Amino acid sequence: MLMMRMMPMTTTTPQRAGRSYLFESESMKFCFNLTTTLCMLLALSGGAFAQQKQTPPAAASAAANAAPESKPLPAPSSAAQKLYEAARNDLLQIRVLLRNGLTQSSVGSGFLVGESDLVVTNYHVMSQIALEPDVYVGEFVDTNGARGSVELLAVDVLHDLAVVRVSRKGTGFFQVPKQTNELKTLTQGQYLYSLGNPLDLGFAISEGSYNGIIGRAFYDQLMFTGPINSGMSGGPNINADGQIAGVNVSKHLGGELVSFLVPAKFVVELLQKVQAAPAQIAAKSSKDFVAEIGRQLNEHQRLMVDKLLEKPLSLKTLGPYAVPVRESDQMRCWGRSNIKPENSYIFDQLNCQMESSIYVSHQLQTGHISIQHYYTRSKDLGSVRFSHLNSVNFKGRSGGVTKDARLTAPSCTEEFIDNQQLSMRAVMCVRGYRKFAQLYDFSLQTASTDQSLMHLQSRLDLKGVSFENGTRVAKLFLEALGKGGQEAKASKASKATKAANQAKDPKEVKNTSEVKAQ
C-alpha cells in the first residue's frame, strides 16, 4: 500500500512505502524551471517561424472560413473560484527554517481560525521545530507575501495536527465550531475543496469528492477523491459552503486522486485544549513538546497492543507447522510462493503488518507491528546445502545491526527452546528510544531445528512499545508457534492470550529472556 503523507516540502526524498510525505526538493524546482524555459524557447521559435512564413491575407481568410469553429475551453468551477477568493486572505504557507542562516528546510500550509491569531496545520509540518527547537524556527507567508513569526502551541501526533500562533489575525472565513456535534455531516459523493500551496508554486484550490472514512487506518481519516500535492500539508479542506471538513494530510502513491484528510472533529478537540488552558500553553518550554509527544506515543502503544491481543491470534498452517498471525481492520496479511517443478527448494511466505504507523520525524515512524513466516522445504538439496541456505536466510532477515542516533545499541539474547513438539532457535533484540525513555523496538526471530529438509523461520517486529508490552507480546508469539492439530493449537493460543491479558501489570509479566535496552 503506497501512500504519501503530505509532508512539508523539503530537500529530502519521500519516505518508504506507506503513507509517504509530500516534500518539495531543489530538483523539483529545477525541473519546473527547465520546463518553463523550454516552453519559452518553443514559444519564441514558433513566433520567429511565423514571421518568416506569413500567410497572405486572402489565403488566411479562406482558411478561416474553411476551418471548423473552435470550441472554448471549459470554464473553471465557479464554486471553486468563489471559495478561493473568499478564503485566500486566511491561507498561509508555513516555512521551517534553519536558525543558522535562515535557509528553508521544509514547507507546508495552514489556515487561520476565525478572527484569531491561531493557525491549524499538520504535526509533520512542525515536527522539526517540536523536536529540535534549537535548530529550527518557523515563519509564515500569506497570499499577499507578508511574513511573520510562528510559535508552536500544541501538537496531536496521533492525528497529525498542530496549532501555532502567528503575528496576524484572520478575517473570519475559516470558522471551527466549539463542539464536535456542531460539525456538518458529510455525505458520500459531495464536493469538497482542498487549499494550500503546492510545490511552493503559489496558493491553489483543488476540487474533489468525499468518499467515506478509511476503515484500515488506526485512527479515522477521510478519503478525498481529488488532487493534493506536496506543500499542501496542513491546508484546509472545505465544503461548498466554506465549512471545514478536514485537513490535508496524505495521498496514495499507488492510485489516482486517492487522498486523505484528518477529520475536522480532531481539529475541534485540539483547539478546545489550547483555548481551555491558554496560560499553561503559553508557559510551555520547547522540552515540554518532546515529553508530550512521548506521552502520546505511549498512549498509542497501549491501545495498539490491547487491540492486537483483544482476541486470540489466528493460526495458519504451513506444512506441519502452525503459525500465529493477526488479521484485522488495522493489519492485513499477504502471501507468496515460488512453487515450480524446476526449483531446487520451495518456499511459502506469509507477511502481516499494520496498515499505518505514527509519524514522529522524517527519519522515525513508529507505533507499528509486523509478523512474517517463511516456510522452506527441499528434495533436491542435501541437508548440508539446505542448512546453509537457511542460515543465510536467517542472517538476511535479521537485518543486521545498524547504527541509529535515535535508538540505543541493541541488546540481544539467544536461546534454544522446545515448544509444543517444535524445537527452535530464538533471538530477541531490544533497542530503546533516546528521546522517549519509555519506548522500545523489539525484534524476535525464530528458526526451527527439528527437520533436516524442512524449515520454518518466523519474525515479530514491534516498534514503539513499552518494555512490558514488548515482552508480553513476544512471550505470547513464542507460545503460539508449534506443531499439532489446528483445534488444539487454537485452544492453546486462546489460553495464552487470556493469560497475557491478565498479566498487564508489569510486576506480573515474566520475561522469556532477560533483556534490557542499553
Where do the PLM segments sit?
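N-terminal activation segment of mature serine protease catalytic domains
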Residues: Q51-F111, N122, A277-I339
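Extracytoplasmic
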Residues: A86-L91, S105-G108, G114-S116, V120, ...
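Active-site region of chymotrypsin-like
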Residues: A87-T103, S167-K178, L201-A279
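Conserved active-site neighborhood of the chymotrypsin/trypsin-like protease fold
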Residues: G114-L195, D200-F203, F218-Q221
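Surface-exposed amphipathic alpha-helical segments
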Residues: V268, P278, Q330-M331, L444, ...
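Signature of long, low-cysteine stretches enriched in small and polar/charged residues
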Residues: H388-T449
